[in-house]
Amino acid sequence: PSFATPGFDVVGCGLNMVDQLVMVSEYPKPDSKQQITRMEYSPGGQVATAMVTCSRLGLRASYIGRFGDDVHGKWGLESLSEEGVDTDACLTAEDTPNGFSIILVDRERGTRTILWSRPPALDLAPSDIQPSLVCAGRVLLVDCHDTEASTTAARCARAAGIPTLIDVEYVRPGIEDLLAQIDIIITSEGFPFELTGCESAGRSLRAIRDAYKPAMVCMTLGKEGSLALVGDAEIRTQGFRVPVVDTTGSGDVFRGGFIAGWIHGGNSTSAADVLRYANAAAALKCRKLGARQAIPTSREIDTLLRA
């Protein structure tokens, strides 16, 4: 894109959460008792964590989302401000607890299982979307949780000539209309198969490209990196080997790293280089427990890329 210079580099519209992370030596069996080896609380949520990543990587980031008015909601909102993310566009639901997750982390495998709760009063509606706010950046990131609101936001951005990205995990009602408004589709590993019914990764990405006409469609592959399709070109980017403590939030950091690598690199940067930058950011995040504790700096990413 030909990036303009509005108030922010990136605006993110979507989910925030607060996580309680519970580490155990191995995943508990049914009807068993398991000692907790470590426990922490951390702010999280897909888009909120991606905006923190962008801010740590030197971008001017704004977050649009709704918080509860309990202690978790207040903490989640404050955590963004402390990270330099603008929260002037945020909303609060009265007498409503914030979105909350309990995350079981298997210490031996580095894997996690998420149990979550998000009251419907926290949902964003299309009427919550103000064009002047979602179009205040050079790039817009949305997720797939409140599909109608995300579709409205993406339409506003596209009408203003602002590139749109999505972090999409699940097939939900309205997802087709949403994807049709997106320029860069970044999916979880399973989403392309669920959406298209195709049995191979490459074929499923091509089906998404043909149906929704994005400039890029990419699936994250965990420790194996990512697979992207730009036009007819497949770009497979290897993951980075780092000591893994917890993968919570790694996909969110991948999206934030992608946006930062794209904006910092400008039009001269190749898609492969942007994807390597995003993979490095996501890998380094896994060094600590929690979605945001180990989000890397630009220097840490550059060091890993040169290694």
Model-found features: residue ranges?
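A glycine-rich helix N-cap at a beta->alpha junction
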Residues: 79-95
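Conserved phosphate/ATP/ADP-binding segment of small-molecule kinases
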Residues: 151-236
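Conserved phosphate-binding/catalytic region of the ribokinase-like
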Residues: 1-11, 35, 201-307
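Gly/Ala-rich phosphate-binding loop of Rossmann-like dinucleotide-binding domains
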Residues: 55, 158, 263
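Conserved phosphate-binding/catalytic loop of the ribokinase/pfkB sugar-kinase fold
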Residues: 66, 92-93, 103-139, 144
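Glycine-rich phosphate/adenosyl-contacting loop at the front of the ribokinase-like
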Residues: 1-66, 71-82, 108
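Short gly/ser/thr-rich secondary-structure transition/capping motifs
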Residues: 84, 119-125, 164-170
